[in-house]
Amino acid sequence: MAGRESDAVSLAGVVLAGGESRRMGRDKATLVLPGGSTTMVEHVLGIVGQRCEPVFVMAAQGQPLPPLQVPVLRDELRGLGPLPATGRGLRAAAEAGARFAFVCAVDMPGLTVDLIDDLVRSAIETDAEVVLPWDGRSHYLAAIYRTDLAERVDALVAAGERKTSALADSSDTQRIVMSDSAPLANVNTAADLPAPVRPGH
């Protein structure tokens, strides 16, 4: 694992790729980005992998993915939202020995290692359980989570919660104001796709 503050902590990565992609009309993870032959999941893994080790991909049962050089964990149940997948990813990261995990959605082609570094820096300085970016709204799926929150996720899911906001609301959460929203942008329709994407920097 290379990179500044992320070298000082045990940081895993969790990429949530199993969303239903209703607005896009097709699976976002395997969407080929403009200007090349790289899929969205491969592009995001290329960025996350620069700062995180190991990296886990959370995918739906039966969801086709390109060959990946990281563990793929399949959802046990469909349609339960991102919280259960986040919890499973945090547990896998904890079992791998990581204290923190960067959890992100797969549909973030503008993601940068600088964003991850900023969040990690705050995690080190504050020792918060959750560190997430804020640009007028909270971005729960581009955030640092302590891996020991996996059991709290289990309790929230058992209580009927499905959104990652429930985890942040029940945790010691630090929000970092971001002046640049581009790394946080999600791709929901074909019109949201950027011009040929450069690797995050």
Curated annotation (Swiss-Prot):
Domain of life of the organism in this record? Bacteria
Sorted UniProt keywords: Cytoplasm, GTP-binding, Magnesium, Metal-binding, Molybdenum cofactor biosynthesis, Nucleotide-binding, Transferase
Q: Which coenzyme or cofactor does it need? A: Mg(2+)
Is Cytoplasm among this UniProt entry's keywords? yes
Q: Report the function annotation for this chain.
A: Transfers a GMP moiety from GTP to Mo-molybdopterin (Mo-MPT) cofactor (Moco or molybdenum cofactor) to form Mo-molybdopterin guanine dinucleotide (Mo-MGD) cofactor.
Where can this protein be found? Cytoplasm
Q: Which NCBIfam families match?
A: PRK00576.1 (NF001855)
Q: Could you tell me the gene encoding this protein?
A: mobA
Listed name of the protein: Probable molybdenum cofactor guanylyltransferase
Question: How does the entry describe the domains?
Answer: The N-terminal domain determines nucleotide recognition and specific binding, while the C-terminal domain determines the specific binding to the target protein.
The entry's cellular-component GO terms read:
cytoplasm
Q: What is its EC number?
A: 2.7.7.77
Q: Does the keyword Calcium apply?
A: no
Which InterPro entries has this protein been placed in?
Answer: MobA-like_NTP_Trfase (IPR025877), Molybde_CF_guanTrfase (IPR013482), Nucleotide-diphossugar_trans (IPR029044)
The EC category is: transferase
Gene Ontology biological process terms in this record: Mo-molybdopterin cofactor biosynthetic process
Main location per the UniProt record? cytoplasm
Q: Which organism is it from?
A: Mycobacterium ulcerans (strain Agy99)
Annotated positions binding GTP: 16-18, 28, 75, 107
Q: Which family does it belong to?
A: Belongs to the MobA family.
A GO molecular function annotation here is: GTP binding
Q: Which reaction does it catalyse?
A: Mo-molybdopterin + GTP + H(+) = Mo-molybdopterin guanine dinucleotide + diphosphate
